[in-house]
């Protein structure tokens, strides 16, 4: 019996479905029993008093209708639903979630109308659960919960930093475009430190060639010498950068560089904390045995997955990452095979960048990747294939509590 059939069977055996449409201040609940009896949608506040009222309503219905099992489901939502979810974790219920995309599509089948209301949505969610199209809700606890929060925070800060760097790039392009060519961008510490002290061509000319060479060599710790200094000095003398409004531009450049420095420091603090919490995860050492997989990557994966023991097979965890394959074919038309991208996007991103490390020379997936390329697969698709294989490997090591052994089959045969 497949998993979907099992889920449908569970719902049909003296089970009550409670579906919730999560809101910012108020939630809408709905109850449906296995025998068809239902309690029409009702509102309850998103606070402790509202949670108690909701639970009392469920408990009364359970006693009246002699219910053996309660399934409470909601859409995969934002932070609004987290307090309610944590309140229900200690209750004798099964918590499940449904894909918002499924809700959007099924609601038209409900009454042949695209109408969306707070009273209609929980009924649609209940329908989806009754069809067996629900997923178990996995809530990280302890160190895993800390890692998820830290990893999400790190992603947001990196996104903000990227936006700042793009703004800085456009400003420098206006007043000193040649700098970007000679220094090959502004992301490096050398570029940022030099810009902080000498942001304009006039600043470099006033400093003088010899001093530019010394300053550049010191800032870059010997990476850039007098050859770069000469090119930079000549570029400053012949720069086509604008002069008008430069004072305002320099004020913004100073602010952005300070912000980038501050965010770099905060990212370092986050990563330090992530490494500390990773030590509290017993199976993390098995994942770190994979060459090319470092502590921050493992922390991010564990934070997104939670507990590997909650997943029964590799297929389930592949689906969580949105790396499960699908195609759209009809008649003689053969569709392209693609990944669904319906799982956790940060997990998928972490695996993709991890794949770039494990395909390097002497990496654990180097041969596998190049075999795919030699067989005509595009590089990006090959990296996605490596991501899938890497996640299956990580799942196996975590579940079996084993260290990675390169060329295991060859060594075991020796």
Language model feature labels by segment:
Residues 1-414:
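A detector of single, family-specific signature residues
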């Amino acid at each position: 019996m497949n998993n979907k059939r099992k889920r449908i069977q569970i719902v049909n055996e003296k089970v009550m479905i409670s579906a919730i449409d999560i809101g910012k201040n108020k939630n809408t609940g709905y109850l449906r029993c296995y025998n068809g009896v239902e309690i029409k949608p009702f509102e309850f506040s998103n606070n402790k008093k509202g949670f108690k009222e909701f639970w009392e309503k469920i408990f009364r219905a359970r006693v009246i209708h002699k219910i053996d099992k309660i399934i409470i489901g909601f859409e995969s939502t934002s932070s609004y639903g987290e307090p309610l979810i944590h309140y229900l974790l200690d209750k004798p219920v099964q918590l499940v979630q449904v894909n918002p995309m499924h809700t959007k599509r099924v609601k038209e089948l409900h009454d042949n109308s695209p109408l969306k209301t707070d009273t209609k949505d929980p009924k649609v969610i209940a329908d989806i659960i009754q069809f067996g199209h629900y997923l178990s809700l996995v809530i990280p606890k302890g160190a895993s919960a800390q890692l998820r929060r830290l990893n999400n925070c790190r992603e947001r800060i990196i996104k903000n930093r990227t936006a700042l760097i793009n703004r800085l790039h456009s400003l420098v392009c206006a007043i000193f475009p040649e700098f970007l060519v000679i220094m090959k961008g502004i992301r490096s510490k050398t570029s940022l430190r030099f810009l902080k002290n000498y942001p304009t061509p006039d600043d470099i000319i006033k400093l003088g060639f010899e001093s530019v060479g010394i300053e550049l060599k010191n800032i870059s710790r010997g990476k850039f010498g007098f050859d770069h200094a000469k090119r930079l000095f000549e570029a400053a003398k012949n720069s086509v950068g604008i002069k008008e409004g430069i004072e305002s531009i320099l004020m913004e450049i100073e602010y952005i560089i300070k912000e980038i420095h501050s965010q770099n420091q905060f990212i370092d603090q986050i990563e330090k904390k992530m490494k500390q919490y990773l030590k509290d995860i017993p199976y993390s050492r098995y994942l770190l045995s994979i060459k090319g997989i470092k502590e921050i990557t493992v922390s991010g994966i564990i934070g997104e997955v939670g507990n590997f023991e909650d997943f029964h097979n590799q297929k389930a965890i592949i689906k969580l990452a949105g790396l499960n394959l699908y195609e759209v074919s009809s008649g003689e038309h053969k569709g392209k095979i693609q990944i669904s991208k319906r799982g956790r996007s940060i997990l998928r991103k972490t695996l993709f960048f991890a794949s770039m490390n494990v395909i390097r020379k002497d990496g654990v997936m180097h041969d596998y990747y190049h075999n795919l390329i030699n067989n005509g697969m595009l590089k990006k698709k090959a990296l996605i294939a490596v991501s899938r294989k890497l996640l299956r490997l990580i799942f196996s090591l975590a579940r079996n509590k084993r260290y990675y052994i390169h060329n295991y089959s060859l060594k075991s045969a020796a």
